[in-house]
Regions:
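Cytoplasmic helix-loop-helix junction between adjacent transmembrane helices
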Residues: 105-147, 151
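Hydrophobic alpha-helix/TM-entry signal in multi-pass membrane transporters
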Residues: 5-13, 73, 101, 144, ...
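Helix-loop junctions on the cytosolic side of multi-pass membrane transporters
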Residues: 121, 125, 167-197, 389-398
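Hydrophobic core of transmembrane alpha-helices in multi-pass small-molecule transporters
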Residues: 14, 97-114, 225, 305-321
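Helix-loop boundary and gating motifs at the non-cytosolic
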Residues: 1-52, 208, 212-259
Length: 398
């Protein structure tokens, strides 16, 4: 059974995710409508959001493994609250230059990285291995509801007030998340890493741990390729909708929210699908849905709102199907003493590749076209699919 400690962690994730999803929606809109950013400048917002994973992921993983994960989560939420309020004040009064906006995005996501790695490192400590898939299922289900509602709420806030007001809500959720984590017992962490090894030695051991475990290695390679393609797509998605297809901000929110019905349906059914066809085949299905969704975006025009709904449904459905199963496989193959470092490696070469994808996506869109960038993202996702299809190690999870 899932216990009180998991429920408190889960609740902290729910409230912080509400603000985070609104902020993810609001960042590009603030850039486009407050700073009048170009496609390359807009893609830089994605770069600044994910660059901390690439630069600091490894050392943050070591800090989390050796530190008190509960305290790390509490303090990072408080710091993120302060940054969110600064973002609101500076953006609403338009006294922050674009480069300053980028810096605050970078700082916010740096501290979010501490919180995220510490959070996911605590889950296997409070949940038995046989219940990990159920725990991941519950978290993906709540995330899907938030992902579905957040864009519409963000669009309404933008229409009634302005995008910077989203940062106020984000700040409030950070405080609430801290309160949930304060309620956790101080001795929740029973597996602290007590070692005199230098950080560089710990980091090297973590990389060897991943690359010598063929299940983790193949899972990692497919994930890294997938998020590279997602990075290209995400960096230009809002620009493509608002500037190329001339979709209004409110309609963008509606498209993403209504389209995210696929996210909710897949989240609800992900456990059943996984139990029926196996975790490996469910991961394959998620890659196919990503490729179909990106392709439909590529084929869309100003009049094809329906295809944008369907495309977003496919992309939304892919996310929980992948996350529940891939995360469960990873967690079940990692020693508790290496949770933070291995999670950080996933961040570095996973989310850390999104800035590279975003930069390339912005460059391709600038020098060629946004449509070409989307097409390239489809091809890259299909390459990730091939890694899973031809992996004998992952077939044990069919």
């Amino acid at each position: 059974m899932l216990n009180r400690n998991f429920n408190l962690l889960w609740l902290s994730q729910i409230v912080s995710s509400i603000g985070n999803k609104l902020t993810i929606f609001g960042f590009p809109l603030v850039g486009i409508f407050i700073y009048d950013t170009t496609v390359l400048e807009t893609s830089m917002i994605t770069v600044m959001s994910f660059l901390p994973s690439l630069l600091f992921g490894t050392i943050i993983g070591v800090v989390v493994d050796r530190g008190d994960k509960r305290k790390i989560g509490i303090f990072t939420n408080i710091i993120c609250f302060v940054i969110s309020i600064i973002l609101f004040v500076f953006s609403i009064f338009k006294i922050l230059p674009l480069w300053g906006f980028y810096i605050l995005i970078f700082l916010l996501n740096t501290f979010l990285l501490f919180g995220s790695i510490s959070f996911y490192s605590q889950i296997p400590m409070v949940v038995e291995k046989e219940n990990l898939k159920k725990a991941n299922y519950k978290m993906e289900l709540s995330n899907s509801v938030i992902d579905t509602a957040a864009p519409s709420v963000g669009g309404i806030i933008f229409g009634l007030f302005s995008a910077p007001f989203i940062f106020i809500i984000d700040g409030i959720t950070f405080i609430l998340a801290s309160f949930c984590q304060i309620l956790l017992p101080c001795d929740i962490e029973k597996y602290k890493v007590k070692t005199k090894k230098k950080s560089i030695v710990h980091i090297r051991e973590a990389y060897n741990y991943v690359f010598n475990n063929q299940i983790l290695f193949k899972l990692a390679m497919s994930y890294f390729v997938l998020v590279f393609g997602i990075g290209i797509f995400q960096s230009i998605q809002f620009y493509y909708l608002s500037k190329v297809l001339n979709v209004a901000p409110y309609t963008i929110g509606l498209i993403i929210s209504v389209g995210n019905i696929g996210l909710v349906v897949a989240s609800i059914s992900s456990l059943k699908i996984s139990d029926t066809i196996g975790m490996e085949r469910t991961i394959i299905l998620s890659f196919i849905l990503y490729a179909v969704g990106f392709t439909l975006y590529y084929l869309s025009s100003e009049e094809s709102t329906l295809s944008l709904f369907v495309a977003t449904m496919c992309i939304g459905a892919a996310m929980p199907l992948y996350n529940v199963n891939a995360t469960t496989i990873r967690q079940s193959n990692v020693d508790l003493s290496m949770l933070g470092s291995v999670s950080a490696i996933w961040r570095i070469f996973g989310r850390g590749l999104i800035p590279l994808g975003a930069t390339i996506g912005g460059g391709i869109s600038t020098y060629f076209s946004v449509e070409i960038a989307i097409l390239i993202s489809v091809i890259i996702v299909l390459l990730g699919l091939c890694i899973v299809l031809f992996s004998d190690e992952l077939k044990k999870y069919t």
